[in-house]
Amino acid sequence: MKKPVRAAIVGALGLAAAGASNAADVVRYPLLGGSTFPIARAVEVPAGKTIIFHSGTTPAPLDPKAEQGTAAYWGDTKTQALSTFARIKESLDTMKLDFGNVAAMTVYLVGDPAKGGRMDFEGFMAAYTQFFGTKEQPNLPARSTVQVAGLVAPGMLVEIEVQLVK
């Protein structure tokens, strides 16, 4: 008699835990001080969710016929960021995910020679805000953006790495 009761209790607790896990949602904490900058201060992933680590993605050449390593070949930071986001979207589509699943993002920007060697943060943000913090896709990731000395190809200015939750 004790075994059936114990099994029923364990089964009920398991179902309750599964229901709670499915009902739990990712929590995105806004920046403090009423900031409207389009990133999350933090993203909390509840138990039972799957975390996916997506490799860094770089842009496709803007003009493959141009001289490799030039701005004509790759484009500026905004152009490269738009291309990179398009390539990430293409990858996410094959995984049945979208930008709303992005919980964290690390952005690597090379200093743009046309900007005196400084990263073009404004150009990057012009691309980023087309995909995040929009009416259609309001979910904001926790994000870090850093300037790096270089990426895998001369003239490449953008690489983006994302972590996703489903």
Language model regions located:
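N-terminal presequence-like segments and the immediate start of the first folded domain
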Residues: P4-A86, E90-A103, D112-K166
